[in-house]
């Protein structure tokens, strides 16, 4: 008896800062639970985000923008990722950081537009007519060559297909005969033919012939069920950026010159507005015909204060364009100078005319009990065991410094606990790593005390 151990094909992913976030943690009425789906506290912000999710699902939020504003470490990025989790895989979600727009290769506005187009999905529904079955007959019909001479040409191909429900005889175009020869189709093979494109696919040999030979390399497949002629609906999800790239960079030939030409091209090519307008026309035509459906997704721009005045102006135009996604901004700044100017001070570093277009969600600082719950969640995600006094001490450290610093102490404390031969992290382990690794406040205090010892 042979027993094989099956290895999992699921990709192992690193435990990141927001691995524990699984959703917004709302009940059926849309009210936030104290601790659910990886989020703790921030009830008002989560309830507001829940309303936004409902609007996105009902397609009533496209072309509008949202701002998550609050101090550092209050869960702005976590709420944005929770929105993405609630929307699911079918709605495009494109995260980026404000500083990503600055590139030596392409313009700032081009980077923004690329990400805008990445956030807009297109769901294309295509009905394919398929003939599927076991080949019972394959007869090419020859005629005299119309060009004269002694040669003969194939005028059509007669093919018989059988399924569990019945049989059908088809008269096919001579071009399909070449495809049949390429696939090496014989009587007894199970094939399917696409009616629209004429594509032929050999699925394998019918399992009724399985006992024909002792040594056989064939793959045997069962006789197809249902009718010979079937209709299949194929749904394809693409983004507008995928269409832009496919049309901006058509594939070259296979010869050496074209391959060298592709290597010589710059890394990034700007997609022209003219091309985008042409693609929009085709997309609109598909939508009018009912072939395709537009799926407005979410563009999440973190650290929005890193954008400058030119990009903010471009955002006005992009948000008011007919095809626009839902844009979520996040910032941890109060009143500060707008980047790209010298003296214009504005709330969150965003111009007032753009702020006027935004719905603002505020995030508040966590209480000590909330911090303790978050640290427990993180410890559970990372598979660490802590004693209750250790959790209490970490939440105190988080309150006096930042939540991020308290969470970052977990892994070094676990290492310290392993060195001491224990399985549970104690309060002493936390104190040890707290004294070894400084937080920003203690480091700046140390810097101000010993300022004359450092180089200017």
Swiss-Prot record:
The keyword Transcription regulation applies. GO terms for molecular function: ATP binding; ATP hydrolysis activity; ATP-dependent activity, acting on DNA; helicase activity; transcription coactivator activity. SUPFAM superfamilies: P-loop containing nucleoside triphosphate hydrolases. Pfam families: TIP49, TIP49_C. SMART domains: AAA. ATP binds at residues 70-77. Keywords: Activator, ATP-binding, Cell cycle, Cell division, Chromatin regulator, DNA damage, DNA recombination, DNA repair, Helicase, Hydrolase, Nucleotide-binding, Nucleus, Transcription, Transcription regulation. Its EC number is 3.6.4.12. Acts as a transcriptional coactivator in Wg signaling caused by altered arm signaling. Pont and rept interfere antagonistically with nuclear arm signaling function, and are required to enhance or reduce arm activity, respectively. Also an essential cofactor for the normal function of Myc; required for cellular proliferation and growth. Forms homohexameric rings. May form a dodecamer with rept made of two stacked hexameric rings. Component of the chromatin remodeling Ino80 complex. This is RuvB-like helicase 1. It comes from Drosophila pseudoobscura pseudoobscura.
């Amino acid at each position: 008896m042979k027993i094989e151990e099956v290895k999992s094909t699921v990709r192992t992913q690193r435990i990141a800062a927001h691995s524990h976030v699984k959703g917004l943690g709302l009940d059926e009425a849309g009210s936030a639970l104290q601790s659910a789906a990886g989020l703790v506290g921030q009830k008002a912000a989560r309830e507001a985000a829940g309303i936004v999710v409902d609007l996105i699902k009902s397609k009533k939020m496209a072309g509008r923008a949202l701002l998550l504003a609050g101090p550092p470490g209050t869960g702005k990025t976590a709420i944005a990722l929770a929105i993405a989790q609630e929307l699911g895989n079918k709605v495009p979600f494109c995260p980026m950081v404000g500083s990503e727009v600055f590139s030596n290769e392409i313009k700032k506005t081009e980077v923004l537009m690329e990400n805008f187009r990445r956030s807009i999905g297109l769901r294309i529904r295509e009905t394919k007519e398929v003939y599927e079955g076991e080949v019972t007959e394959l007869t090419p019909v020859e005629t005299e060559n119309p060009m004269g001479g002694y040669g003969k040409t194939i005028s059509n191909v007669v093919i018989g297909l059988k399924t569990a429900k019945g049989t059908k005889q088809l008269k096919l175009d001579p071009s399909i005969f070449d495809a049949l020869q390429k696939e090496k189709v014989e009587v007894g093979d199970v094939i399917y033919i696409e009616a629209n494109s004429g594509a032929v696919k050999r699925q394998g040999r019918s399992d009724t012939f399985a006992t024909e030979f002792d040594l056989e390399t064939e793959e045997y497949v069962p006789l197809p069920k249902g009718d010979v002629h079937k209709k299949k609906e194929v749904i394809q999800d693409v983004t507008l950026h995928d269409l832009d790239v496919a049309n901006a960079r058509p594939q070259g030939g296979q010869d050496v010159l074209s391959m060298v030409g592709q290597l010589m091209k710059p890394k990034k090519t700007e997609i022209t507005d003219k091309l985008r307008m042409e693609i929009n026309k085709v997309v609109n035509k598909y939508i009018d015909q009912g072939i395709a459906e537009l799926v407005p997704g979410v563009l999440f721009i973190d650290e929005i204060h890193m954008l400058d005045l030119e990009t903010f102006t471009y955002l006005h135009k992009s948000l008011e364009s007919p095809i626009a996604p839902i844009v979520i901004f996040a910032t941890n700044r109060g009143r500060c100078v707008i980047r790209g100017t010298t003296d214009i001070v504005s709330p969150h570093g965003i111009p007032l005319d753009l702020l006027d277009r935004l719905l603002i969600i505020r995030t508040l600082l966590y209480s000590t009990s909330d911090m303790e719950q978050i640290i427990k969640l993180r410890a559970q995600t990372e598979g660490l065991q802590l004693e209750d006094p250790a959790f209490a001490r970490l939440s105190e450290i988080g309150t006096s410094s930042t939540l991020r610093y308290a969470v970052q102490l977990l892994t070094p404390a676990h290492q310290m606990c392993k060195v001491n031969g224990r399985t549970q992290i104690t309060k002493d382990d936390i104190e040890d790593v707290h004294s070894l690794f400084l937080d920003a406040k203690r480091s700046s205090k140390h810097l101000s005390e010993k300022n004359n010892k450092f180089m200017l």
